[in-house]
Swiss-Prot record:
CC terms in the record's Gene Ontology section: periplasmic space
Subunit structure: Heterodimer of a catalytic subunit (MsrP) and a heme-binding subunit (MsrQ).
Gene Ontology biological process: protein repair
Protein name as it appears in the record: Protein-methionine-sulfoxide reductase catalytic subunit MsrP
Primary gene name: msrP
Signal peptide positions (record): 1-40
PTM note: Predicted to be exported by the Tat system. The position of the signal peptide cleavage has not been experimentally proven.
Organism whose genome encodes this protein: Histophilus somni (strain 129Pt) (Haemophilus somnus)
Length: 317
């Protein structure tokens, strides 16, 4: 993993490339009518967490209000500020996370167990959106492999499938097809079992020392730092181990633009924009824009490249 330095972290820029797909589906009038909100204030009413601090404590992080105020979470609207606005009353307790499928030991975690079942630790990761913007985030959580080891995958298990909560009464984007970007909910993502078992793959329940804010995927989300952000599914209620590969949400919506693997790759462009460089979200104002080269696997090439040995990454994007 390439060591992060202060220059890896972010000046601010508003970048709405994903809105192009909204236009492609005839939803531009609705999307552009949505309000833009200022960056969220740092939250003081979220649960403080007990966790092992990262040894990378000298790193300068993306400001908390940018991480909590600049989000893609289409269940709460397609505008970057919509999730912070529309999710502010989202109820995450009680919560159930069901783990099942091709496992010997299916089980369920309640809200409190999300924070206590496994020891929590801080992981400072790069975060790269497919829209070509980036952050550095101090996630708090536990390795997904710990949860999978408890479930004991069977020999048939090849994929790990994740489902976001389906609750149209709380999630306006699920209730209104246009407000939610034309997605067929619930949101579904998946990893190969090898990807899911990798030590970098995190189940996050917090950031900046506190429980996740609703707009960041409370109470529990996936974080896969070498993949584009849409793979890091939010507000998960079900994890199913499967013998067959599912069709994931963005792959189903636009398969020519969003592949199953979604590995960060500067040599494989999105059909409508380059992935060779990225804009960073950080402490500066709108005029302090910084662009930096995109790193293969988002800087985690040494750790994860072996997972894709022999795989054509241009075809399997």
């Amino acid at each position: 993993m390439k060591k992060l330095i202060s220059n890896d972290v972010t000046p601010e820029e508003i970048f709405y490339q994903r809105r192009k797909i909204i236009k492609a589906f005839g939803l531009s009038a609705v999307a552009t009518a949505l309000p833009t909100f200022s960056f969220a204030q740092e939250s003081s009413d979220l649960k403080a967490l007990e966790y092992k601090k990262s040894t990378e404590s000298t790193l300068i992080l993306t400001p908390e209000n940018k991480v909590t105020g600049y989000n893609n979470f289409y269940e709460f609207g397609v505008d970057k500020g919509s999730p912070a606005h529309y999710a502010k009353n989202f109820q995450v307790n009680p919560w159930k996370l069901d783990i099942g499928g091709e496992v010997e030991n299916p089980f369920t975690l309640n809200y409190d167990q999300l924070f206590t079942q496994f020891p929590l630790e801080e992981r400072i990761y790069r975060f790269r959106c497919v829209e070509a913007w980036a952050m550095v985030v101090p996630w708090i959580g536990f390795e997904l492999n710990k949860l999978l080891e408890k479930a004991k995958p069977t020999s048939k298990a090849k994929y790990v499938v994740f489902h976001t909560l389906y609750d149209p009464e709380q999630m306006p984007g699920q209730k209104n097809h246009f407000f939610g970007g034309g997605i067929h909910y619930p949101y579904v993502e998946a990893l190969t079992l090898a990807e899911a078992m990798h030590s970098l793959t995190l189940m996050s329940v917090g950031l900046y020392g506190k429980a996740l804010a609703p707009q960041n995927g409370a109470p529990i989300r996936l974080v896969v730092p070498w993949k584009y952000g849409f793979k890091s599914i939010k507000s998960i209620v079900k994890i199913t181990l499967s013998e067959t590969r599912p069709r994931t949400t963005w792959e189903s919506l636009a398969p020519n633009e969003y592949g199953f693997y979604a590995n960060v790759n500067p040599k494989v462009d999105h059909p409508r924009w380059s992935q060779a460089s990225e804009r960073v979200i950080g402490a500066g104002g709108l005029l302090s824009v910084k662009r930096q080269p995109t790193l293969m696997f988002n800087g985690y090439e040494r750790e994860v490249a072996h997972l894709y040995k022999g795989l054509d990454l241009r075809i399997n994007y």
